[in-house]
């Protein structure tokens, strides 16, 4: 597996626990929107401590972008990433990933599971092909929603949020249920893209099966 040492160009806080990293792009390095790579911090102690992260930018960008949820309590790679600054080095490796765009459909994300969809939607918008897609984004609170303004601008009324902990009049409250899907999605004769925590994904697969969605219509990544 090829390894590329790249310098961090910039870091930005997007939410209380999510950061955007832009790093140098190796010559000739390409990916399909929705794909990921294994990243590590380029220090002797951490270079072999790899974790998967999804590309959130576009191939046309002069940098690679990653939007990463930080888990300080896990004492792992994201905690180390949180302390890095421009000029520090990461190692990026070959691309991989199960989620790629297969045609218009409904995208359902839980928390940091939104990241593969960011690149997909940005790519669709750049090609003026975003119409006909819907995004349902499940989070605990409004403060957890990643890139809400960007998704609202791209998708309008087809960007739907649901909050499981915080109750606000402008958002549905609770967990995604079969009833919620029935009232929100309407037409189930289309593709579904799912990414989020395994318990959520398992529940969604069961709910969608009950609503008549076949396995062939599902693209899933945990």
For the regions a language model picked out, list residue spans one by one.
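N-terminal helix initiation/capping motif
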Residues: 1-2, 92
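Ferredoxin-reductase
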Residues: 2-86, 139-141, 165-166
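FNR/FR-type flavoprotein reductase catalytic core
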Residues: 73-222
């Amino acid at each position: 597996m090829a390894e590329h040492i790249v310098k961090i160009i910039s870091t930005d806080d997007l939410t209380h626990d999510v950061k955007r990293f832009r790093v140098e792009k190796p010559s000739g390095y390409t990916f399909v929107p929705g794909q990921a790579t294994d990243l590590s911090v380029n220090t002797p102690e951490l270079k072999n401590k790899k974790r998967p992260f999804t590309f959130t930018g576009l191939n046309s960008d002069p940098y690679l972008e990653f939007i990463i949820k930080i888990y300080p309590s896990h004492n792992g790679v994201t905690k180390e990433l949180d302390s890095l600054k421009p000029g520090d080095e990461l190692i990026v490796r070959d691309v991989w990933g199960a989620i790629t765009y297969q045609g218009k459909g409904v995208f359902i994300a839980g928390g940091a599971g939104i990241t593969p969809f960011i690149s997909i939607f940005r790519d669709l918008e750049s090609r003026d092909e975003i119409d006909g897609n819907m995004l349902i984004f499940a989070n605990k609170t409004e403060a957890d929603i990643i890139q809400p303004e960007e998704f609202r601008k791209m998708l309008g009324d087809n960007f739907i949020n649901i909050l499981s902990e915080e109750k606000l009049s402008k958002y549905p409250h609770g967990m995604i249920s079969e009833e919620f899907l029935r009232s929100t999605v309407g037409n189930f004769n289309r593709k579904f893209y799912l990414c989020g925590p395994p318990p959520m994904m398992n529940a969604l697969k069961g709910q969608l099966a009950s609503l008549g969605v076949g396995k062939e219509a599902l693209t899933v990544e945990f």
